[in-house]
């Protein structure tokens, strides 16, 4: 108990990879491959976890991101390389209901 299931870790990794890729390429796509390496347990009852992602390769329509998930002790617990096939923006808008990159960069309104 209190250990984050590997499938949930993979879901978090896939999600953060998509944000990195979508913001880098300004369009949407779909996951085509994900290679995950589980190195340490991730506890859910002893502190916060965090992830970071970086686009590492762009080869035409295939974009790769490397993702790292850190456990509650700030140790690298899981890492993955995630490959997405991206679509031209017009296709992404039609097939994936892509709202456009601007939807992800709306300025935060100042409090009055």
In which residue ranges do the predicted regions lie?
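Hot-dog-fold acyl-thioester-processing enzymes
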Residues: 1-19, 96-112
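HotDog/MaoC-like acyl-thioester-processing domains
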Residues: 42-45, 56-112
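Hydrophobic beta-strand-centered segment that forms part of the acyl-chain substrate-binding groove
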Residues: 16-50, 55-56
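Amphipathic, positively biased hydrophobic alpha-helical segments used for protein targeting
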Residues: 13, 17-22, 29, 64, ...
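Conserved beta-strand segments that form the floor/walls of ligand-binding pockets within enzyme
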Residues: 3, 31-37, 50, 64, ...
């Amino acid at each position: 108990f209190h250990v984050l299931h590997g499938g949930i870790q993979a879901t978090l990794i896939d999600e953060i990879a998509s944000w990195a890729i979508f913001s880098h390429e300004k369009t949407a796509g779909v996951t085509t491959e994900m290679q995950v390496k589980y190195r340490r347990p991730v506890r859910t009852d002893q502190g916060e976890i965090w992830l970071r992602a970086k686009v590492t390769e762009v080869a035409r329509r295939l974009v790769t991101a490397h993702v790292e998930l850190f456990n509650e002790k700030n140790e690298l617990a899981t890492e993955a390389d995630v490959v997405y096939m991206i679509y031209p923006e017009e296709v992404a808008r039609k097939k994936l209901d892509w709202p456009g990159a601007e939807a992800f960069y709306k300025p935060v309104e100042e409090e009055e």
